[in-house]
Regions:
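Loop/helix-junction capping segments adjacent to catalytic residues or to phosphate/diphosphate-binding pockets
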Residues: 16, 83, 153
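Conserved N-terminal subdomain of the carbohydrate kinase-like
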Residues: 2-7, 23-109, 114
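Short, glycine-rich nucleotide/cofactor-binding loops
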Residues: 9-15
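Active-site glycine-centered loops adjacent to acidic/histidine catalytic or metal-binding residues
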Residues: 10, 103, 137
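Conserved phosphate/ATP/ADP-binding segment of small-molecule kinases
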Residues: 117-167
Length: 167
């Protein structure tokens, strides 16, 4: 049986991240990709030119539509953007019983901020407790923990333990 994997993330017009990259990865590993878009971005390999978050009602409509009709075996969460989107996704995830991978996307590789600073608390407090696996990079882990970035193997290990304790 093919696994149905739902990705909840932003759309990257450059195709190198977000929904587009997730769907490619899901397909390449033999899964069937489903998607719910949290934001539209105008970006390329150089940077992010604009971000347009989807309306909460439309986000909820996407979640309801896909989950009503298709079995979801696992969920991957990426860019959420705003506190409202983060809380709405967390509410949806609280009713899901399968594996949930959360990539707490906060900053693009170009350095552009993708998660509002006021959404970090919602991500940490509402979303991470739903996660089976969280995949922060060093700056994201520091942001989630409200501390400086880990710079040694020991501090990285400590940050990892603290992130695990969040959920």
């Amino acid at each position: 049986m093919i696994a149905n994997i739902l990705t909840i993330a932003g759309s990257d017009s450059g195709g190198g991240a977000g929904i587009q990259a997730d769907l490619k990865a899901i397909s390449a590993t033999g899964g069937y990709g489903l998607s719910v878009i949290t934001a539209l971005t105008a970006q390329n390999t150089v940077g992010v030119d604009a971000i347009y978050p989807v309306a909460i009602d439309f986000l909820k409509a996407q979640l309801e539509s896909v989950s009503r009709d298709i079995r979801i075996d696992a969920i991957k969460v990426g860019m959420l953007g705003t506190p409202d989107v983060t809380v709405a996704v967390a509410d949806f995830l609280s009713g899901f019983d399968g594996p949930i991978v959360v990539d707490p996307v906060m900053v693009a590789k170009s350095g552009d901020r993708l998660l509002h600073a006021d959404a970090v608390a919602a991500l940490r407090d509402a979303l991470l407790p739903c996660a089976t696996l969280v995949t922060p990079n060093l700056p994201e882990a520091a942001d989630l923990l409200g501390t400086s970035e880990a710079s040694s193997k020991e501090s990285m290990t400590e940050h990892a333990k603290q992130v695990v304790a969040l959920g």
